[in-house]
Amino acid sequence: ILATGIFVLIQVAWLAYLLLYFYRDYAWISLLSTFIAIILVLKIYGTSTNSAMKMPWIIVILAFPILGILIYLLFGRSIVTRAVKKRFNSIEESYKKSLSQDENILKEVKDKDIYIYNQFHYLSNHEGYPVYKNTDIEFYSIGEEGLEAQLKELEKAEKFIFMEYHAIEEASSFDRIKDVLIRKAAAGVEVRLFYDDVGSIFFLNKDFIKEMRANGIDCRVFNPIKLAFNMFMNNRDHRKITVIDGKVGFTGGYNLADEYFNITHPYGEWKDTGLKLTGDAVRTLTMLFLSMWNSIKKTDEPQDD
């Protein structure tokens, strides 16, 4: 892991050195970089990305053309290969077809508040995510409350447990969850665990997947880091989802690492919120998990050996 990070930093530093060297000694490099910067700024401005995301890049590129262009090309673009994008979109669309909108629910909302109805109608018609009734929501103002509630519901699992997180840490908070997952897997419950490689890079050892699979837990990694730097490395999975039997779901801002539950304090007191959903709306959480899970092939993952 450390070697990978050092290798990437060396590549970035070397590219920056070369660009600055030519920029200083060759006037035409300055003119070319300015021209490219203008084209790039126009391209960024014309995208559908939120303005809050576009403006910082535009400012950096115009203020420091050479370095700005380099940094944007390395970290500013969300680059996904056509094959990966096609595979994910195909899987997501197939799952969305199973999520039908009850028009009576939209009518009820429209009769009560046209402003809220317009938002719900957009989500349902344009994004394919239905609006639900028959769902209880419990809000947790701190991650510690969410973790305790999550552990209680995991103990009740009878059919399946799906978990997808940006960061998982092998420490006391996740150890409690892992204990439940291992026991449930041994009892015949289907357990799937999915995490982002970069988010967990300093938290998990290289044998984590082996351990999970040895205990009957189907474990996958999103976009594992390769030694050679590539643009796709910047695409990360920041979801925090737990689904239990398709009836109960959890989401929120906390990952499964001790710092999120104030067991450790590397950045001071941490506050993140969480939600527990019980009822029909859990269907969408299930679809979101499965669409990402099934978009990752075995060939996309690091090998056990």
Predicted regions and their residues:
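N-terminal localization/anchoring segments of enzymes in phospholipid and broader phosphate metabolism
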Residues: I1-D305
